[in-house]
Amino acid sequence: MTDTTLIIRQLGIQDYQQVWQQMREFTDTRNVLTADEIWLVQHPAVFTQGQAGKPEHLLNPTDIPVVQSDRGGQITYHGLGQQIMYVLIDIKRHKANGSELNVRQLVTALEQSVVSTLADYGIKSYPKADAPGVYVNEQKICSLGLRIRKGCSFHGLALNINMDLSPFRQINPCGYIGLEMCQMADFIPTEQAQCDKVAPKLVTHFTQLLGYNDVTTY
């Protein structure tokens, strides 16, 4: 195992809390020989609050469960048709361009992976320095939230591909009042806006940016 070894796990549709617990257990038990991993998953409808989450950003409580998470950021929504990519990376071990990878570089790599993926579909997008994530025409298409423990990351990004966006209207997404959300299906044909088609492109861009060359998919 080297710094360029990566395991990709395709988890399908799984409960948020179950996967969150698995991420914590993986991070707590990994050691210097543990390969980095990417987990690709979709979650059934759930609101998640970040560590700094404020209850007033949940505007209209519904029957959608709310989970207090340990990631960074404020409240967001997960649902089917949204591709989630969790990144379980030993930051202190990984070398990027000859220097130690830091959290800011990891966030930038995640954002750039999304920007490049969207560009593959002709969608022009951009990150914001003061509001992590990726945007199209001032609407947010991808949310980011990480947790660092023992120098290792978990949690990751959520890219809206082809989903019901209406639950976002029940919250101030990421704590921003009036922030509008969008998805890939707003800009490209539905048959192209599918998680199983978009995810491989997203992973490819991310692995190239971080220099992984020994990649195994399960």
Curated annotation (Swiss-Prot):
The entry's substrate-binding residues are 71-78, 143-145, 156-158
Q: Which is a GO BP term held by this UniProt record?
A: protein modification process
Top-rank taxon of the source lineage equals Bacteria
According to UniProt, residues marked as the site described as Lowers pKa of active site Cys are 140
- Pathway the protein acts in: Protein modification; protein lipoylation via endogenous pathway; protein N(6)-(lipoyl)lysine from octanoyl-[acyl-carrier-protein]: step 1/2
One GO location term (cellular component)? cytoplasm
- Supply the EC number(s): 2.3.1.181
Annotated active site = 174 (acyl-thioester intermediate)
Q: Which SUPFAM superfamilies match?
A: Class II aaRS and biotin synthetases
Query: One Pfam family for this entry, by name?
Result: LplA-B_cat
Per UniProt, residues of the BPL/LPL catalytic domain are 32-214
* Coiled-coil stretches noted in the UniProt entry, renumbered to this chain: none
One Gene Ontology MF term = lipoyl(octanoyl) transferase activity
Miscellaneous note of the record: In the reaction, the free carboxyl group of octanoic acid is attached via an amide linkage to the epsilon-amino group of a specific lysine residue of lipoyl domains of lipoate-dependent enzymes.
Family note? Belongs to the LipB family.
Described purpose of this protein according to its UniProt entry? Catalyzes the transfer of endogenously produced octanoic acid from octanoyl-acyl-carrier-protein onto the lipoyl domains of lipoate-dependent enzymes. Lipoyl-ACP can also act as a substrate although octanoyl-ACP is likely to be the physiological substrate.
Query: Which HAMAP family is this protein grouped with?
Result: LipB
Q: What is this protein called?
A: Octanoyltransferase
Recorded source organism is: Histophilus somni (strain 2336)
